[in-house]
From Swiss-Prot:
Signal peptide: none annotated. The lineage of its organism: Bacteria, Bacillati, Bacillota, Clostridia, Lachnospirales. Pathway: Glycan metabolism; pectin degradation; 2-dehydro-3-deoxy-D-gluconate from pectin: step 4/5. Catalyzes the isomerization of 5-dehydro-4-deoxy-D-glucuronate to 3-deoxy-D-glycero-2,5-hexodiulosonate. The keyword Phosphoprotein does not apply. GO terms for molecular function: 4-deoxy-L-threo-5-hexosulose-uronate ketol-isomerase activity; zinc ion binding. GO terms for biological process: D-galacturonate catabolic process; D-glucuronate catabolic process; pectin catabolic process. It catalyses: 5-dehydro-4-deoxy-D-glucuronate = 3-deoxy-D-glycero-2,5-hexodiulosonate. Keywords: Isomerase, Metal-binding, Zinc. Binds 1 zinc ion per subunit. InterPro entries: KduI, KduI/IolB_isomerase, KduI_N, RmlC-like_jellyroll, RmlC_Cupin_sf. This is 4-deoxy-L-threo-5-hexosulose-uronate ketol-isomerase. It comes from Lachnoclostridium phytofermentans (strain ATCC 700394 / DSM 18823 / ISDg). The gene is kduI. Zn(2+) binds at residues 194, 196, 201, 243.
Length: 276
């Protein structure tokens, strides 16, 4: 498990491109037959992936958590962005199709990942946050989620937000998770942009071709920077930072938030005329 420390906006505005990428970009997810995990000190979120091809992958706590098992004091959200796969939780097998999700509550001990077809393996994307109590484990189908259509083609930001884990739908201690899919011809996400000082966020960009990219904008509104994102790469966004992107084509991204509250609409809007 890789560890990432928190960074101050006073320091970040002086970072080079390489340093920005080193601190915030996660560019080595979805390795074949591996579970890859990145532990951020920002609200203690863990971001990761599991790609079982010809073997089952078992989730273990590792020394970093100092726990008997991974979810002893944590909860987890998962979205499958690959082929059909299974997640086995304490002996119960759940089958996940493409873009199906899973919430696993605190206290689940034995968790393993497998693919149904090794030639089209599952790609499980993982977010995990500290938890204080146990909520029920839920298999999540996107067609049963709250879906909100926003933006317009004229604004180049026509998109559908699919909310997987949030209060009133799938309960959690603090993790809020979902997916945003841009419509063809739209390239902007989260513009006009915002911050939310009560929560940090991680984005995973995918559904992109090899030569496509997203310019992910971050930093304080008056000190913006960008990181170029490729397919199936994630980026950590501190609570003080904007988080917005513009791609060469339409794309999809998964967002996961942890922090002080779970109010999706608790945002501090940025006036576009103030952006620099």
């Amino acid at each position: 498990m890789e560890l990432r420390t928190a960074a101050s906006p006073k320091d970040v505005k002086h970072y080079t491109t390489d340093r920005l990428r080193e601190e915030f970009l996660i560019d080595d997810l979805f390795k074949v037959n591996e579970i890859k995990l990145v532990y951020s000190h920002i609200d203690r979120i863990i971001t990761g992936s599991a790609v079982p091809v010809n073997q089952e992958l078992k989730l273990t706590a590792g020394d970093e958590l100092r726990a008997e098992y991974f979810l002893q004091r944590r909860e987890m959200g998962i979205i499958n962005i690959g082929g059909k796969g299974t997640i086995t939780i304490d002996g119960t097998v759940y089958e996940l199709e493409y873009k199906d999700g899973m919430y696993i509550g605190m206290g689940a001990k034995d968790i393993s990942f497998a693919s149904v077809d090794a030639t089209n393996p599952a790609k499980f994307y993982i977010n995990s946050a500290p938890a204080h109590t146990s909520y029920p484990t839920v298999l999540i189908k996107p067609e049963n989620c709250v879906n909100v259509e926003l933006g317009s083609l004229e604004g180049s930001n026509h998109r559908v937000i699919c909310k997987y884990i949030l209060p009133g739908q799938v309960e959690s201690c603090q993790l809020v998770m979902g997916m945003t899919q841009l419509k063809p011809g739209s390239v902007w996400n989260t513009m006009p942009c915002h911050t939310h000082d009560r929560r940090m966020e991680v984005y995973l960009y995918f559904d992109m071709q090899e030569n496509d990219m997203v310019f992910h904008y971050m930093g304080e509104p008056t000190e913006t920077r960008h990181i170029i994102m490729r397919n199936e790469q994630a980026v950590i966004s501190p609570s003080w930072s904007i988080h917005s992107g513009c791609g060469t084509k339409a794309y999809t991204f998964i967002w996961g938030m942890v922090g002080e509250n779970q109010d999706f609409d608790d945002m501090d809007a940025c006036d576009l005329k103030d952006l620099r």
